[in-house]
Amino acid sequence: MAVFTPPSGNSNSTDHTHTQDDHDKDDNDIKKFYIRPSLGLKLWGPLVPAPDNLPGLYTLITIQSAVGFFALWRLRRLYKLPPPRRIATGTHSDLSFGELPSEMIVNGKTKIKKDIADFPTLNRFSTTHGDIVLAPPPIIPRQSRFVSVRKLLWGLFGSLLLSQSLLELTRLNFLKYDPWCDEMKSVRDKKFFNNIVKYYHEGIDPTKIKVKDAMNGTPLSTNIPEVKQSVALARAQVEAQNPIIKWFGPLEYKPMSFNEYLNRMEFHLDMFEFFQNKRNIRENSIELINSISHNPQSSSTGLEGLSESKKLHLQNVEKRLHFLASSGDSISAPVKRSSTTLSRGVILPHDTKGPQDIDLDTIRSLYDPWMTLALETSLSIKFIPTTMPSHTKTPTSTDQPLPGPTPKALTNEKTH
């Protein structure tokens, strides 16, 4: 028989375990390093610098291009290497490289003549002379497989490096908009200001940092807000000038994917084309107006057509007004009020009979809508400082509330 005893504080322990696991997961995410994006420097792996680090990018491009040219130079040396041939020396023959003498080639490449006395295996002191006809050398000399594989590897390696370097140079020099570069600049700025806020809230350790007045050299208190701001700014600048941060950017930065990069580039190109077409339309309209103003005779026919249509329109308007005026006499007119009140609270004089009797300047000065809105609106804004949440410490019932304004202090009132 067994007795089960539940552990004390089970709920608190599980909550603490979950919070600790979440905190460890956040730390692991922060410590994870992402390879910086690039188009032609992917062979360098994690050594690729940040997209906005132009000196680092050009340094890697130079090294990569130099290695590519060296590979092509080695390929050229292999192609210039002459084919092997055997030279008889004494009682054995050795495999050596060299070109046949020009006097051995007769009638182009049809045959080769060699004097018998030049062969060392025969009698050197013989007075007999004759010619031996040899086969002409092949147009494409035979080579070993090792030499062919070396040529293939050097050619592919050099071409790959140079093409990748050219692709990266195109991205840096010919693209007017680079999403990766803009993203890295914004990430650096955010990191810089976040470090200022973090160091300001951390405060100053008097045992490590001492602040003195620049004028007289007297030590200053580290609890002054201005001193804390200056020290936080200096610490953030020192961290931003770190060689690793300058090369890679913020270490926790996760770059955008290549698909998102292409989407932003496509959107930028579409917007550029839209504004380009809009500017072309505006320029064409300006040219058309200038041509009409400078050449009135060429556009006289068009202006005459416009004037005729305008005259017809005015005649139609006059006929309609005359019809309304004649029909208004037969209809009983409504009783007019002594004063007219509009929906916006504008009171017109009693002698106002039509829109032509309204003095717009006077009405505007008396009933300015923006001034009315300013007088009817009253705003009261108060700023409350924010606090950093803590992942390790959980609030208890014994904790005292922090001094400061309550949420009711933030008010936004509107009075009429």
From Swiss-Prot:
Chain intervals with Basic and acidic residues compositional bias: 15-28
Chief place where the protein resides: mitochondrion
One GO CC annotation: mitochondrial inner membrane
Positions in the Mitochondrial intermembrane compartment: 1-56, 170-416
Membrane-crossing residue ranges in chain numbering: 57-73, 152-169
Keywords recorded for this protein, A-Z: Membrane, Mitochondrion, Mitochondrion inner membrane, Transmembrane, Transmembrane helix
Mitochondrial matrix face residues: 74-151
InterPro entries: i-AAA_Mgr1
Residue span of region Disordered: 1-28, 390-416
Superkingdom of origin organism: Eukaryota
Membrane topology: Multi-pass membrane protein
One Pfam entry name: Mgr1
Compartment annotation: Mitochondrion inner membrane
Residue ranges, compositional bias (Polar residues): 390-400
Function: Component of the mitochondrial inner membrane i-AAA protease complex required for mitochondrial inner membrane protein turnover. Required for growth of cells lacking the mitochondrial genome.
Protein name: Mitochondrial inner membrane i-AAA protease complex subunit MGR1
